[in-house]
A protein has these predicted regions:
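Active-site-adjacent loops and short helices of periplasmic peptidoglycan-processing enzymes
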Residues: 1-141, 147-154, 212
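Domain-terminus/edge residues, biased toward the C-terminal soluble/receptor-binding domains
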Residues: 120-121, 132-137, 141-243
Length: 243
């Protein structure tokens, strides 16, 4: 099976790291909001979920997809991670980065160190949200490696597997519901995460994870207009062949 529509894809056995099938998997590409997989992982490894975060004016005004944070709002790190992974809040990504590392630049350094540690040889991060930058790229293979690694983190798993979550602004006590924009988790048997992304330049990007019969498969698609159908086709095939 080879979804012709994808710029690149990589299907990986999460347990062994074996590449089941791929297309252009080692080509450097733009990744859009799938960046936030690394943002969430670095945050989870470096700060407690209960940490409280006060939102700045700059963060509240971030361009692109948003969880609509307002300056002065206070949230737990956990709720910001939910907003970042479920509705792809760029505002949340910046607030998380500043809180965890002191500044966006310091956080990005942590992202790149982690990428090296995992063995992501064709990846460089320039920001925590994935908006376009010349210096911000990955490959389908590298992202699949990252997803396999991240899904070993129980908190990460729980967050990206949420179909929806109630988040609470702590000064007002006001709660809102965040519904996961990653439709793949509703559509594919065994699907349990991870993240979608889209910019005009990167196209539609999807990192998907699914578990069946004790096996976990990761599927990464970059620049694929038919992302959900392609992922379903590739993962079905992978599970069939791994029986």
């Amino acid at each position: 099976a080879s979804p012709a529509t994808a710029g690149a894809y990589c299907v990986m056995d999460a347990q062994t790291g074996e590449v089941i099938c791929q297309k252009n998997a080692y080509t450097r590409m733009e990744m859009a909001s799938t960046t936030k997989v690394m943002t969430a992982l670095v945050a989870l490894e470096n700060a407690p979920l209960s940490l409280t975060v006060r939102i700045t004016r700059a963060e509240a005004g971030t361009e692109g997809s948003s969880m609509y944070l307002r300056a002065g709002d206070v949230y737990t790190l956990e709720d910001l991670l939910l907003g970042m992974m479920l509705v792809s809040g760029n505002d949340a990504a910046l607030a998380v980065a500043r809180t965890v590392a002191g500044s966006e630049a310091s956080f990005v350094r942590l992202m790149n160190e982690k990428a090296q540690e995992i063995g992501m040889c064709d990846t460089h991060f320039d920001n925590p949200h994935g908006l376009h930058s010349q210096e911000h790229y990955t490959s389908a293979y590298d992202l699949a490696l990252l997803c396999g690694y991240a899904m070993q983190n129980a908190e990460f798993c729980r967050i990206v597997g949420c179909k929806s979550a109630d988040i609470k602004e702590l000064t007002s006590g006001e709660t809102r519901v965040m519904v996961n924009k990653n439709r793949f988790i509703y559509a594919f048997e065994g699907a349990d995460g991870i993240k979608i992304g889209y910019t005009r330049r990167a196209g539609r990007c999807l990192c998907a994870s699914a578990g069946r019969d004790g096996k976990r498969m990761i599927c990464v698609l970059l620049n694929d207009a038919d992302w959900f159908a392609s992922a379903a086709e590739l993962l079905e095939e992978a599970f069939k062949n791994k029986r």
